[in-house]
Amino acid sequence: MKHFSFSVTVVILVASLGIGAEKSKKIRPAKPSLTKALAALKIPPPWFARTTVQWKTSQPWKKGRIEIRRLLGLGTAEGNNQAVKLTYLYREKRDIGNGHEWPMYLFMGGQTAWATRAYEEFIGKNPERNTHAYIDLMSCYRTFGEYAKAKATARQAMKNLPTDKWRVSNQANVYEALGDLYAELGDKAQARKNYVQAAALYPKSKQPYGRHLLARRVKKVRGKIDLLDIGALEPGKLPDGKYHGDSLGYTGPLRVTVTVRRGRITDITVRHTEKIHQNATKIIPKRIVDSQSLKVDAVTSATVTSQAIVDATLNAIRKAGRK
């Protein structure tokens, strides 16, 4: 897959805006056990029997994958289940391209444990030129708190970077993913170090297409660096009004409009071009409004979009702070 990847998942950095600031540190809920999840995994899962797929797999994979992405884009449990089952059926008939989309659609469909196993198998057979798979596997491991495995996967990714014009951007992607990992662990120094390396590498990429997105990638990474140390705003200090903020989502630009009333965020609307966002464009704004903080959990399988919404909201609030 010869393009620089956008990781299926990035951490929502835990920088509170301080609006309705927390008086005590919240205890992070325990991560689910990967060992237990894999032990309980049944392939195919029991819910396959209850899931009806209308699509005819007699049609070629190049058409089937479009239907799968449409189903994932519905942002519903039933849509996800149909997408996963359809992907499975194509894999069973050995019509699934080079196979890189098999674990990816499992993860996007919310089957994280299954995706973890599938990514491990795919990388084991295809260790080279699949940086996107390594980064997505890192995301799977982080979901289960397997941080040592995530770091080891990053090292493996660095050893198997493409040797062509995609090498630099893929290397930057790995550094950015490491920054997300360390940010989740609360290691600001290591997070910053990796983000800085990513931001320095993106502009140097000589990739044959997609260069127009590199400046946006740099801007987004710098936003993550800013989130590491952002100071808290005192409750009620935001000026009333509407403010716009921009970021880069999974498929293109994303803009939010933040409404502030009586010093509090009362509404966040999202304008975007995302096709598969798993309702993150509705769920993340609600979480920010409810908590009056950017310290919100990402939507599983749509963490790129989730992070973009947080980043754009931060940009909008900065404008409010300068008013």
Residue positions per predicted region:
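Positively charged n-region of N-terminal signal peptides that target proteins for export
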Residues: 1-4
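Short, hydrophobic/aromatic-rich segments at coil-to-beta transitions
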Residues: 237-245
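Active-site- and interface-proximal helix/loop "cap" or "latch" segments in soluble metabolic
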Residues: 23-80, 87-90, 112-118, 244-323
